């Protein structure tokens, strides 16, 4: 059996009991990480897993290059799939983890398509998203009653963002590291309720509603902005 386990956004206590119990009983645990141009490997998922006192011999990382060229990424997904399928065929219980929720911008989804194509048994354990934790930390509801919510990853144009702010009550912006200039052009012209969060659930967590402070920060990958009218 293959399990997709959501780890939550960073705080190790935010995993579900079901997810943690599966991790403890799994024969193999696969986790994603990032491979940078200097060949450094970093895994946010592993930093969460290390809190659970798991047998380190069960842990297997797969590392994806942090660029828009998908050649290396596709190769890693294929080789990782083949390793997992071998484990599966040998009758092992396999867990594959993802930070946040495994159904939301997760690298696991690319493996899932391969599992389904090969008719492997899979169960997904959902989890807490970063924007849900961000709203909780700032004591601010994402939406109420008939309000509408949209999630935009790596918003490319001011027009796209402006249209979202007209048509939706709450706009969650993810993957913002490279598009702060686009966001600035919009939020500097009109007043919005701005909630910025980075590295949620970790000892490096930072939260702010001051746009002048936000736009001058060095924005990390694990960051997001929530805008409300």
Question: Can you annotate each of these PLM segments?
Answer:
Residues 73-80, 138-140, 164-168, 208-214:
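Short, surface-exposed amphipathic charged segments that create phosphate/polyanion-binding patches used
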Residues 100-164:
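Class I SAM-dependent methyltransferase SAM-binding "motif I" and its flanking Rossmann-like core
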Residues 36-39, 129-132, 180, 202-204:
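Short gly/pro/ser/thr-enriched loop/turn and capping motifs at secondary-structure boundaries
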Residues 21-22, 88, 141-145, 162-166, ...:
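Solvent-exposed alpha-helices and their adjacent loops that cap or buttress functional pockets
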Residues 34-36, 99, 121, 148, ...:
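Flexible, glycine/proline-enriched loop segments at strand-loop-helix junctions
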Residues 65-70, 130, 157-159, 202-205:
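A short acidic, often aromatic-flanked loop/helix-cap motif at beta-alpha or helix-coil junctions
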Residues 1-12, 17-20, 24-120, 212-215, ...:
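Class I S-adenosyl-L-methionine
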């Amino acid at each position: 059996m293959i399990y997709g386990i959501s780890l939550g956004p960073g705080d190790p206590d935010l995993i579900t009991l079901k997810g943690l119990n599966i991790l403890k009983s799994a024969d193999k645990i696969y986790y994603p990480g990032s491979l940078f141009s200097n060949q450094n490997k970093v895994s946010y998922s592993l930093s969460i897993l290390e809190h659970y006192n798991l047998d380190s011999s069960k842990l297997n990382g797969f590392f994806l290059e942090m660029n828009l060229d998908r050649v290396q990424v596709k190769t890693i997904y294929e080789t990782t799939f083949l390793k997992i399928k071998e484990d599966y065929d040998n009758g092992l219980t396999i867990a594959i983890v993802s930070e946040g929720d495994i159904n939301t911008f997760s690298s696991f989804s690319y493996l899932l398509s391969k599992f389904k194509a090969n008719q492997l048994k899979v169960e997904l354990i959902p989890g807490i998203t970063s924007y849900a934790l961000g709203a909780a930390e700032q004591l601010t509801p994402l939406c109420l009653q008939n309000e509408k919510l949209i999630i935009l990853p790596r918003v490319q144009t001011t027009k796209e963002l402006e249209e979202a702010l007209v048509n939706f009550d709450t706009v969650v912006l993810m993957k913002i590291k490279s598009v702060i200039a686009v966001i600035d052009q919009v939020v500097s012209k009109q007043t919005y309720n701005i909630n910025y969060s980075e590295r949620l659930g970790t000892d490096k967590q930072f939260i702010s509603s001051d746009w002048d402070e936000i736009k001058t920060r060095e924005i990390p990958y694990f960051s997001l902005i929530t805008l409300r009218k």
